[in-house]
Amino acid sequence: YGGAMAYGESASAGNAVAEYEAYRTNTSRKEFNGNAYLEWEPLKDLKLNVSYALRYYNQFSKSIQNVVNQMNFQTNSIARTMPDTGDIISNSNNEGHKTLFQGRITYEKEIFKGHHISAMFNAAEEYWFQRNMGAGRKNRLHNSLEELDAASKEVQTNDGKSESEGLRSFI
């Protein structure tokens, strides 16, 4: 791939094809959004309402760094090797969900023509959960190999975290 090709051009001139070949990421994502709702009127003027919502996602990414030499065609030499960090491959997984459960009781009555009295009670609970995991290795055995096990075990990293949070409210 070309780098500096014109007289006086910087050796670190950008090359879009080289950037694409050097840093590649493949991502697959699965996601679900669902809602359920029920409303019931057991007595006249009294309504019960229950709803539930769920959002779930799972995303897997594979990042690959290929070593690419950019040539200076005027001097027939390598102008720049990228990335300068070497042959790295990494995998990451991001998974989580959010739930919302809500219940409501409503009473509304017309006591005189044009005059209403109403009361409402609402309870809601939300919950969020997220987990991230990642692993990386350096020094792939060959540029055509894209699996994590296709790299040396000498230089490897692992990381991850999980977090959750909830909220409960009454009105």
Where are these regions (language model features)?
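Surface-exposed loop/turn segments flanking beta-strands in extracellular/periplasmic regions
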Residues: 1-18, 66-85, 131-160
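Outer-membrane beta-barrel transmembrane strands
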Residues: 16-63, 88-112, 116-118, 130-132, ...
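N-terminal glycine-rich FAD/FM-binding segment characteristic of electron-transfer flavoproteins
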Residues: 122-124
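Conserved "boundary/linchpin" sites in short secondary-structure elements
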Residues: 126-128
